Amino acid sequence: MNVKTILAAKKRNLGGDIVSIEPTADLAAAAKLLSAHRIGAVVILGAGGHLSGILSERDIVRALSEHGAAALNLSVGQVMTRNVATCTADESVASIMERMTAGKFRHMPVVVDGTLTGLISIGDVVKHRVEEIESESEAMRDYIRTA
C-alpha cells in the first residue's frame, strides 16, 4: 500500500480538501482554524501556492510555553516548522510510518512534482495499516476454512 491509497480514501470520505493558512496570520487565527476543522496541523502556503511550512498543535504549545498568552499575537510564519518532511504519493505506508516515528512528527505533506497534493497524518497511516492487516487476516481465515 502506498500514500496514494490513503489520499484516495481521504478524498472519498472527507472531500480531500487541504486546509492552509497564510504565514502572516496570527497564531490565534491558526488555533481557531485547527479547532474548526478538528485537525492537528495546517500547511502554510507561500507565493505561488508553494509549501512554506507546517504549523502543528505542538508548535502552538511550544510558542505558548515560551511567550505566554502573547504568543497568540505572533505570526504563523514566526512559529511554523520551516524544514518540512514531505513524501510523494508513491511512497510506501511502511516507509512513511518509519519516517514519522523516527522524526517524532504526526503530519506529512504529500508533494508531487513540486505541488502540494495532500496531507497525511499518523492516524491516517495507522488506520489504513489496521485495515490492511484485518483484510489479510480475513483472507487467511477464509483460506483455512476452505482447506
What name fits each language-model region?
Residues 1-147:
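Tandem CBS (Cystathionine beta-synthase) repeat/Bateman regulatory domains
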